């Protein structure tokens, strides 16, 4: 198994270079299986887009914490890596029945930096306490690898462009000796448009896509000495648009532009654990994004959109 370090969008962006809506695929020549490949790519983009949203968002917005900080000015910084097992399809060989075989399986990790800041300590028992939430997503750009490009308006830091997330966590009740802390949270995350290829420079295909995510979470957490435990559930909405162009042959339908709207929602659940050593905490998470039957016409070996997907997170926290 290989390991790769990618932006969530880059997990499936190569697919989008051949993707189009069904009617757009009809304009592509059927010779050599080009139209069948296009239709399979459409299904793959629909299937894998929520996985990109999942690995961007993770589960708990503050690993191993179920409630708010409980005091104004408290700060928690988390250096986090989300990941999942990605089944990479081989679109060069599609069976007559529409089955796409798996080319490889990779562990796809995505780095995120997150912050929690106490704003309001709340009323009695922590009710209506408020924490501000923030995140920074690291997105490779043209300085990271040849052929990549990122939104020119995106904030850049050397070889990466930055995507940002903002939100809030509201306390329901504080933790006591006999009960866990409870909280609700909402976050909005945005990954800048990222792409590769340039048909004007001689490439056969080019593609770019963006991703926006809304994350709603309900969490509970408890501490037992050094041990931190939290669990929760939530709902995500992912949206974006993929644009592309292709110049694959001189035949009619061998050149053109495409645009594919992407809009999906998913439920998920997660369990966290951690060890606290003063201001340092080692944390982890395992979660599950529930599947949705999208009635795909293509079967992808190793992937079932109705079965859901498991994701993982590891994090190092600093609390002040």
PLM feature spans:
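Outer-membrane beta-barrel translocator domains and adjoining extracellular loop/strand segments
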Residues: 88-94, 142-154, 193-203, 240-252, ...
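Detector for outer-membrane/organellar transmembrane beta-barrel domains
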Residues: 177-267, 272
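Residues that define the transmembrane beta-barrel architecture of outer-membrane proteins
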Residues: 71-73, 106-113, 156-166, 208-214, ...
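Membrane-embedded beta-strand positions of outer-membrane beta-barrel proteins
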Residues: 75-81, 115, 132-134, 168, ...
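Transmembrane beta-barrel domains of Gram-negative outer membranes and organellar outer membranes
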Residues: 21-164, 172-174
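Predominantly the C-terminal beta-signal and adjacent terminal strand-loop region
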Residues: 22-24, 264-269, 274-320
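Transmembrane beta-strands of outer-membrane beta-barrel pores
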Residues: 81-87, 119, 136-142, 172, ...
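Outer-envelope beta-barrel architecture signal
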Residues: 71-75, 126-130, 176-182, 214, ...
């Amino acid at each position: 198994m290989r390991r790769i370090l990618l932006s969530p969008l880059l997990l499936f962006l190569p697919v989008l270079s051949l993707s189009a809506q069904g009617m757009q695929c009809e304009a592509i020549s059927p010779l050599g299986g080009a139209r069948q490949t296009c239709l399979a790519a459409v299904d793959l983009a629909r299937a894998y887009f929520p996985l990109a949203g999942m690995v961007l968002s993770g589960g708990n917005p503050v690993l191993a914490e179920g409630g708010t900080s409980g005091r104004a000015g408290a700060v928690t910084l988390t250096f986090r890596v989300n990941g999942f097992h990605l089944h990479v399809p081989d679109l060069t060989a599609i069976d007559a029945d529409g089955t796409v075989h798996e080319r490889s399986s990779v562990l796809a990790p995505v780095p995120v930096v997150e912050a929690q800041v106490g704003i309001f300590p709340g009323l009695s028992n922590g009710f209506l306490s408020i924490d501000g939430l923030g995140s920074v997503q690291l997105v490779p750009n043209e300085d990271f690898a040849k052929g990549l490009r990122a939104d020119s308006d995106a904030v850049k830091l050397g070889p990466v462009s930055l995507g940002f997330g903002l939100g809030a966590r509201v306390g329901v009740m504080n933790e006591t000796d006999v009960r866990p802390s409870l909280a609700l949270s909402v976050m909005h995350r945005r990954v800048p448009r990222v792409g590769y290829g340039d048909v004007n420079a001689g490439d056969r295909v080019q593609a770019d896509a963006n991703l926006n995510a809304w994350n709603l979470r309900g969490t509970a957490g408890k501490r037992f000495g050094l041990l931190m435990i939290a669990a929760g559930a939530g709902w995500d909405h992912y949206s974006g648009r993929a644009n592309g162009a292709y110049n694959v042959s001189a035949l009619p339908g061998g050149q053109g532009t495409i645009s594919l709207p992407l809009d999906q929602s998913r439920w998920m659940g997660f369990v966290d654990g951690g060890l606290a050593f003063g201001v340092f905490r080692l944390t982890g998470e395992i979660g599950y994004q529930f599947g949705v039957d999208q009635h795909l016409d293509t079967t992808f070996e190793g992937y079932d959109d109705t079965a859901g997907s498991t994701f993982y997170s590891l994090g190092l926290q600093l609390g002040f």
